[in-house]
Regions:
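Active-site donor-binding segments of glycosyltransferases and PAPS-dependent sulfotransferases
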Residues: 51-119
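Membrane-proximal helix-turn-helix segments that form the acceptor-binding/catalytic region
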Residues: 149-182, 190-191
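Conserved donor-binding/catalytic core segment of Leloir-type glycosyltransferases
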Residues: 214-251
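Nucleotide-activated donor-binding/catalytic signature segment of Leloir-type glycosyltransferases, i.e.
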Residues: 260-283
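Short alpha-helical donor nucleotide-sugar binding micro-motif in glycosyltransferases
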Residues: 283-288, 376
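Acidic donor-binding loop of glycosyltransferase active sites
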Residues: 286-298, 311-312
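A charged, aromatic-enriched C-terminal amphipathic alpha-helix characteristic of glycosyltransferases
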Residues: 336, 352-381, 388-389, 393
Length: 409
């Protein structure tokens, strides 16, 4: 057995899920370094296919749920790179080549969960490959400029990184041809799949644990809340500036590279709690005046958790959040600035804090774990049984070592 196998169980890879009984299944995930929204989707599939082999680039042992850690996990050659678990994002240029090491063997179904290279796995001829797509490769498409910002003070390296991303974009588009069926996490992502890959997809939104995230008996307090990684594209500085300028209280839960900079701009009413466990986050959802969500997300699971706890949500009305948050459960605003967020807070408070907790709860319950499981497994069953014919354009596989195309959208 390969040294990269993290579980030595002699699994057969066969499913015991209704409608999928007896199938040999391979699961593919970009990397396994912690339990985030994507890993919660993966966990559902691991429970449905406990004997499947799980392929990934790298695996941080003990960082995932028992359902995931109990799988047979096969990693790529990147796992053997010293320090990879701390610096894996810097190894982006090596990821397409590493993905070529995935060999799924004789299986009946391949399911990838991808925002980077997982969809590049190649199934045996005639085997359906369903990709649950969090977004097309972020670094090559809509996140390209943000990735290059890290090299703004090094023009030569920035130019080289830009050329690399152009080649990555070409490779990413070609690798999509190995997917027989795309499933998008939101209408926003469905549109990107159509734009970048010229492919149709079905939308199945990610799950929220509405049994855990539920209203409590706590009274609403005066503080606003942000729950987020403290990284640039989350735009947490806009919430901090809006609350600092208006003298409002704000609690920020989360860690990231931006924390020091954000703390310097924050007023006395802003408190940083750092990383917190789920029970602390749930407690703050139950007590906050409202959740502030200034980032543009592919879907946005945090607002749904807040809604499940009965909290209002004031969010930037772009991306996936615009599909779940509206005036009935909070407010949205169109311009990604601190001024626009502050104006939204002022207007909402002037209206008397209108909010319907029961409606917010129902909105979240439509995305509960059992709903997600039923929809996703039902879709997989229909694919396997030929009810969703594949529509794959005749695009050849382009090795990452080839020269990038010009004028790629």
């Amino acid at each position: 057995m390969d040294a990269s196998v993290r579980s030595v169980s002699a699994h057969t890879g066969r499913s015991t899920s209704p409608g999928l009984t007896g199938l040999r299944v391979a699961l593919v995930h970009d990397w396994l370094t912690g339990m985030r929204g994507g890993e919660k989707c993966l966990e559902v599939l691991c429970r449905a296919f406990p004997d499947a082999t799980l392929h990934t680039l790298i695996h941080r042992r003990g960082a995932l749920s028992p359902a995931i850690e109990g799988m047979t996990i096969r990693t790529s050659p990147l796992q053997r790179v010293p320090g990879v678990l701390r610096h894996y994002r810097k190894l982006l240029p090596l990821m397409p080549l590493s993905a070529r090491s995935w060999k799924v063997g004789q299986v009946d179904l391949v399911v990838s969960l991808s925002h980077c290279v997982a969809k590049a796995v190649r199934p045996p001829r005639g085997v359906p490959h369903v990709c649950y797509c969090f977004t097309p490769m972020r670094y090559a498409w809509q996140g390209r400029d943000a990735y290059l910002e890290g090299w703004s003070d090094r023009p030569i390296r920035r130019a080289l990184a830009g050329a690399m991303l152009n080649r990555m974009r070409t490779w990413d588009r070609a690798s999509a041809a190995g997917v027989t069926h795309f499933v998008a996490i939101s209408e926003t992502v469905r549109e990107r799949i159509g734009l970048y890959y010229q492919r149709e997809s079905q939308v199945i939104c990610p799950p929220v644990d509405t049994d855990y995230y539920a209203p409590g008996s706590e009274e609403r307090e005066n503080f606003y809340l942000c729950v987020s990684a403290l990284v640039p594209f989350k735009r947490i500085e806009q919430a901090i500036l809006a609350c600092t300028r208006s003298g409002r209280e704000l609690v920020v839960i989360g860690e990231g590279t931006e924390r020091t900079r954000l703390e310097k701009m924050a007023g006395p009413g802003v408190r940083f709690l750092g990383w917190q466990p789920d029970d602390v986050i749930r407690d703050h959802y139950r007590r906050c005046r409202a959740l502030l969500f200034p980032g543009e997300e592919d879907f946005g699971i945090v607002p749904i958790e807040a809604l499940a706890c009965g909290a209002p949500v004031l969010a930037l009305g772009l991306g996936g959040v615009a599909e779940t948050v509206d005036g009935a459960v909070g407010r949205t605003y169109a311009t990604p600035t601190a001024e626009a967020l502050l104006a939204t807070i002022d207007a909402w408070e002037a209206e008397g804090l209108p909010h319907d907790p029961a409606l917010a709860r129902r909105r979240a319950e439509a995305l509960a774990l059992p709903v997600f499981r039923e929809r996703l497994l039902g879709h997989l069953s229909e694919v396997v049984n030929g009810q969703h014919p594949a529509h794959v354009p005749p695009a050849p596989h382009v090795p990452f070592t080839s020269r990038g195309q010009k004028n790629v959208r």
